Amino acid sequence: MTSLKMCTSVAAVVAIAMSNAMVASAHSFPESETPSAGQQVASAPAEVTINFDAPIEKLFAKLEVTGADGKNEAAGAPQISDDGRRMSVKVASLKPGDYTVKWAVVGIDTHHTEGSYTFSIASGGS
């Protein structure tokens, strides 16, 4: 009976260790964006926001919003929510046209992820 209890205890410890490893290895990827990828908005947004599926490190967060001229329209550094899952940046008065949002983050698991997407502002929407 003692060996059965020992095997059960070892199995429980291994299961807990494996579940913790799976949680720790989760990378941070966008769940949603505002404006969203591919969206054409009627008026210029005051800010661009990305919601992540896992917390990100504030120190390593980057968010750029560029127009056709390549100029970064972000007004300052990105702001990170208290729970670390939301990154936003204010933008200057954007004119109608196409914009590319480029982001790069480091999750609390220390893994770097990055990506980009586009949105557009309809004519007359500045």
List the predicted regions and their residue ranges.
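Bacterial N-terminal signal peptides that target proteins for export
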Residues: 1-11
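Cleavable N-terminal signal peptides
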Residues: 13-14, 24
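N-terminal signal peptide c-region/cleavage motif recognized by signal peptidases
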Residues: 19-23
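Extracytoplasmic/periplasmic copper-protein system
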Residues: 25-31, 39, 112-126
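Short, surface-exposed alpha-helix to beta-strand junction/turn motifs within ectodomains of secreted
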Residues: 48, 54-73
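Short strand-edge motifs at loop-to-beta-strand transitions and within beta-strands
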Residues: 85-89
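A glycine-anchored, Pro-Gly-centered beta-turn/N-cap motif
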Residues: 95-101, 115
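Beta-strand-rich extracellular modules
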Residues: 104-108
